[in-house]
Amino acid sequence: MKLLRYGPSGQEKPGILDADGRIRDLSAHVPDLSGDVLSDAGLARLRAIDPATLPLVSGEPRIGACVGHVGKFIGIGLNYADHAAEAGMPVPKEPVVFGKWTSSICGPNDGIDIPKGSVKTDWEVELGVVIGATCKDVDEARALDYVAGYCVVNDVSEREWQIERGGQWDKGKGFDTFGPIGPWLVTRDEVPDPQRLDLWLEIDGHRYQNGNTRTMVFTVAQLIAYLSSCMTLQPGDVITTGTPPGVGMGIKPSPVFLKAGQMVRLGVEGLGEQLQHTRDAR
């Protein structure tokens, strides 16, 4: 299934794509795509519904983040060896974990706000993993059983705040609009191998990032097992699993960063695309 949330920010309704790619409304069956709705049992109930029997959503509504009420938005850094090299950092021996504030979450096509005074706002196309069941201390072999589905994430980052101003990375990762998620939550059964997905990103039509999740340092299963050893993962938590090379700060001889008035387009194989316009923060 391809699940989504549509409508004005803060008033999103749950939906599903039918066989023709049209949005059907699910709000008579579930209040949101969150919590127990994301469990195997909850998704099985949705799967039993014939989308053709659901109300058709007219027009072209805004698409919101594909998960509601996210509890934890967990980032993984330097998870592609070639990205670590372009960043001038060693390949990590353990996952680099940071937090993205849930207030950064927005829809896949919402605008990206360039923070006041920022000259180092950067892009990162990533595979997002949505947890569907509570897990603690899970084995790598069973880790994917706890996944509800997958989505596209743009881990927008302000490099000065992330790297140059001391402290943790979180500061540069959590500005408002720095967490576009979606358009769809593609359920686990439709993604047979999360380690075989192409991902890409373009700025104003120029392709900067081309990668595949097979080159991750730590696989999705390894990340879930690792994270569950130091925290309890809960339904609706989102893990964004790192980016391939081609980010702005790694461009030689001179880095390239986002500025207002640009168009960012990105996607992950089978999970849809995002399209964002950049603007100065108000």
From Swiss-Prot:
One of its GO terms (biological process) is urate catabolic process. The keyword Secreted does not apply. Keywords: Hydrolase, Magnesium, Metal-binding. SUPFAM superfamilies: FAH (SSF56529). Coiled coil: none annotated. Its EC number is 3.-.-.-. GO terms for molecular function: hydrolase activity; metal ion binding; ureidoglycolate lyase activity. Mg(2+) binds at residues 124, 126, 155. Gene3D superfamilies: Fumarylacetoacetase-like, C-terminal domain. Its cofactor is Mg(2+). InterPro entries: FAH, Fumarylacetoacetase-like_C, Fumarylacetoacetase_C_sf. Belongs to the FAH family. PANTHER family: FUMARYLACETOACETATE HYDROLASE DOMAIN-CONTAINING PROTEIN 2A, FUMARYLACETOACETATE HYDROLASE DOMAIN-CONTAINING PROTEIN 2A-RELATED. This is Putative hydrolase Bcep18194_B0137. It comes from Burkholderia lata (strain ATCC 17760 / DSM 23089 / LMG 22485 / NCIMB 9086 / R18194 / 383).
